Amino acid sequence: MSKAVVVYFSGYGHTKRVAQAAAEGAQASLVEIDSEGNIPEAAWDLLDQAQSILFGAPTYMGSVPWQFKKFADATSRKWFVRQWQDKVFGGFTNSASLNGDKQVSLILMHTLASQHGGIWVSLGLAPANTSASSRADINNLGASVGALVQSPSDADAQAIPSGDLETVKLYAARVARIGQQLHA
């Protein structure tokens, strides 16, 4: 059984890099939502067997893109039979701006997990909020609900700040660890 799964949509490659960091931190399987908002049929079984699931999506125009929302709506067949009841969930999002209304995307993911009767894991990392803080610091965007990432709009995925990627790794490891503890 795969203990942790990262399911994500990436429009321009930035979220894919973040999802890979999350998978590394959680030692998780990766499931990519395609450009039509679908996942492979076998991926549904992988999600069903997981102890913990991390959602990932960019924030476009103040929320998740339609491809992630289509996936979220497709989970209703799991909701109907309470397939994901008591699973552990977390989520991450990125946008080009430091704020970019990313919190809305995390709240959507949190709500989706709650609809399924899941247990949402907070970030659990103190913010880097002193005058000496930099973008290389852990949780330099000051998140608490989940992981936030800023991806420069004029650069490729390699330009994502190291502090953001490390924050995602640590958070994903926390989600997976709590999933293992609750389902031991």
Curated annotation (Swiss-Prot):
Induction: Up-regulated by oxidative stress conditions through an OxyR-independent mechanism. Makes part of an operon that consists of PA14_22510 to PA14_22540. Is repressed by the LysR-like transcriptional regulator PA14_22550.
Disruption phenotype: Cells lacking this gene accumulate higher intracellular ROS levels and exhibit decreased tolerance to H(2)O(2) toxicity compared to wild-type siblings. Inactivation of this gene also produces a moderate but significant decrease of 24% in the intracellular survival of P.aeruginosa in phagocytic cells. During in vivo infection of Drosophila melanogaster, flies that have been fed with the wild-type strain of P.aeruginosa die faster than those fed with the fldP deletion mutant.
Gene Ontology cellular-component terms listed: membrane
Domain of life of the native organism: Bacteria
Cofactor(s) this protein cannot do without: FMN
Pfam families, sorted: FMN_red
Keyword Ribosomal protein in record: no
Binding residues annotated for FMN, in chain numbering: 10-14, 91-147
Occurrences of domain Flavodoxin-like (ranges): 4-176
Xref: InterPro entries: Flavodoxin/NO_synth, Flavoprotein-like_sf, FMN_Rdtase-like_dom
Molecular function terms, GO-annotated: FMN binding; NAD(P)H dehydrogenase (quinone) activity
Keywords from the UniProt entry: Electron transport, Flavoprotein, FMN, Stress response, Transport
Annotated family: Belongs to the FldP flavodoxin family.
Protein purpose: Flavodoxins are low-potential electron donors to a number of redox enzymes. FldP protects the cell from oxidative stress and reactive oxygen species (ROS) damage, thereby expanding the capabilities of P.aeruginosa to thrive in hostile environments, and contributes to bacterial survival within the host. In vitro, is able to mediate ferredoxin-NADP(H) reductase (FNR)-driven cytochrome c reduction.
Protein's name according to its UniProt entry: Flavodoxin FldP
Taxonomy of the source species: Bacteria, Pseudomonadati, Pseudomonadota, Gammaproteobacteria, Pseudomonadales
Gene (name only): fldP
